[in-house]
């Protein structure tokens, strides 16, 4: 069924009791052409495999329910304000896919291009933002460099006067914004299912079978499932799943916390990031401030953080907006992020025939979902990288071709 005004009116006559299921709950087949592990980027990959490459004998294996992983545990921000030539075109393509997301998948994902503003607090940071903005514009993106007065016009309640970290200006990307994170896996699942993809929930991979250097299938909690090609898109569990195939990945897993405050009157129109500390905030449609900051800094697979980081993140928020000191936090949650050694992702085939890897997303996984799935589908279908992900090779760390957007070196917890 196509969602629209007519289907809404039709189902309103029955009190909305006769809506069909958005996707099927199939039993696993004995084998598939392609299996994708992970219900975040994996769903996007399956959709684009079916749509762009007509490969429909595909299964997506999710160990929990759809949306229970990082795809539903983020702060909903989308942006493409990168500078390096390896990153910028990729994220700009993702932004373009976001802009057509709802029309393409026939699903209301609440795509809101309300703008993303990065604050700067020194002359050097202002110059760096000017360079970044120029790089964005060269690659076809949008960027506006604001001085302190320009920022004050947008957000007069920020700490401008006698501030510990004076605001010198900011870099605004008007096309950035937010997307309802729960709606993204639902939209991809519905669209992929309509094209024949099997989405198998509560199916955890426990092993990978390799015969003579080639993938033969996966062992799961629902039995063995054979396949010709296997794509790993397991986010924070990438290292564990990769180890099942004998891969030792240049990735660390860390917990990252996110928070939402009590509901407030309209306050923050867009997305704002603090330049003197790691803090980013937007306001949801319910009025809650959705915010986050640094990862907890220690390796963990637990989806919960510690109070020291809660204090650290909120201190940064209050330094930017003193009025937040009186706002109560409603709840918090955690997700496991796969931190690569240079802060950039890996989308590549491996040395094992038929095995492909999508991992190392650090803080940037959600915003990259469409482009990640699109490029990963191309890599799996054609057994070669697309130009957009050609630089995201697994062997770049050995070859010395790292993509270090922040320039902090091989320290995963700093990216």
Please describe what each predicted stretch is.
Residues 89-92, 119-128, 171-190, 200, ...:
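Short beta-strand to alpha-helix junction loop
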Residues 171-229:
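Helical element adjacent to the flavin cofactor pocket in flavoenzyme catalytic cores
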Residues 75-157, 278, 308, 316-318:
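Dinucleotide-binding Rossmann-like beta1-alpha1 core, especially the glycine-rich loop
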Residues 248, 263-356:
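Active-site lid/adjacent beta-loop-alpha segment flanking the redox-cofactor pocket in flavoenzymes
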Residues 318-415:
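C-terminal catalytic lobe of FAD-dependent flavoproteins
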Residues 220-269:
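Central helical "cap/lid" subdomain
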Residues 50-71:
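Glycine-rich FAD pyrophosphate-binding loop
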Residues 1-33, 51-55:
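Extreme N-terminal leader/targeting segments of oxidoreductases
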């Amino acid at each position: 069924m196509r969602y629209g005004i007519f289907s809404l009116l039709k189902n309103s006559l029955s009190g909305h009791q006769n809506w069909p299921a958005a996707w099927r709950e199939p039993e696993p087949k004995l084998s598939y052409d392609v299996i994708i592990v992970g219900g975040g980027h994996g769903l996007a990959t399956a959709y684009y495999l079916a749509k762009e490459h007509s490969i429909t004998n595909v299964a997506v294996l999710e160990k929990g329910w759809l949306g229970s992983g990082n795809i539903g545990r983020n702060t909903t921000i989308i942006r493409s304000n990168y500078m390096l030539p390896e990153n910028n075109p990729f994220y700009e393509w993702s932004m373009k896919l976001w802009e057509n997301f709802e029309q393409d998948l026939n699903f209301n994902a609440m795509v809101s291009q309300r703008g993303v503003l990065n604050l700067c607090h020194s002359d050097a940071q202002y110059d760096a933002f000017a360079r970044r903005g120029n790089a964005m514009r060269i690659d076809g993106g949008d960027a506006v460099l604001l001085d302190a007065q320009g920022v004050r016009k947008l957000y007069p309640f920020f700490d401008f006067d006698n501030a510990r970290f004076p605001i010198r200006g900011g870099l605004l990307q008007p096309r950035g914004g937010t997307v309802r994170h729960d709606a993204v896996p639902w939209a991809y699942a519905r669209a992929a299912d309509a094209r024949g993809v099997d989405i198998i929930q509560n199916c955890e991979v426990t092993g990978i079978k390799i015969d003579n250097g080639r993938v033969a299938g996966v062992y799961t909690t629902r039995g063995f499932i054979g396949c010709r090609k296997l794509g790993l898109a397991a986010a924070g569990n990438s290292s564990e799943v990769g180890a099942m195939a004998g891969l030792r990945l240049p990735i660390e897993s860390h917990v990252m916390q996110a928070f939402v405050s009590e509901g407030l009157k309209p306050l923050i129109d867009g997305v704002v990031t603090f330049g003197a500390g790691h803090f980013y905030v937007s306001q949801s449609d319910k009025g809650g401030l959705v915010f986050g900051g640094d990862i907890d800094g220690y390796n963990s697979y637990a989806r919960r953080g510690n109070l020291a980081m809660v204090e650290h993140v909120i201190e940064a928020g209050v330094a930017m907006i003193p009025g937040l000191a009186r706002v109560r936090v409603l709840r918090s949650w955690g997700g496991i992020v796969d931190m690569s050694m240079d802060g950039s992702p890996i989308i590549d085939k491996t040395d094992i025939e038929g095995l492909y890897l999508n991992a190392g997303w650090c803080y940037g996984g959600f915003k990259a979902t469409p482009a990640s799935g699109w490029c990963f589908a191309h890599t799996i279908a054609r057994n070669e990288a697309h130009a957009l992900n050609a630089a995201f090779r697994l062997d770049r760390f050995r070859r010395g071709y790292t993509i270090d957007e922040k320039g902090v070196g091989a320290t995963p917890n700093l990216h």
